[in-house]
Amino acid sequence: SSDYRLKENVVYDWDATARLKQLKPARFNFITDANKTVDGFLAHEAQAVVPEAVTGTKDAVEVWKDGDELPDGVSAGDNKLDADGNTMPNVQGIDQAKLVPLLVKTILELEARITALEA
């Protein structure tokens, strides 16, 4: 929520430009669609800069949990396997919308620098 009544420790003066410069945008394709190139981030790299925007843990895999209906010979804590016997990744993701405040603050900082240089 954006309601001020739900927030505390509000700070307006922080160096967004320095933080933004730590992000490493990349061009890549997904293994499932080798013919399509996209621009984005690698989640584990972005997590070091904007952890609030990243979900999951690098290299995590799906595991069987207590309460799951366990197949024969499987225990809670064992890795889940696909039909080919490969571990099933628990992939990371990035909520791109959570990058918007950082981008806006960086634009404002750069605009202030331009204005100062033009003065």
Language-model-detected regions and their locations in the chain:
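Intramolecular chaperone/auto-protease modules of tailspike-like proteins
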Residues: S1-A119
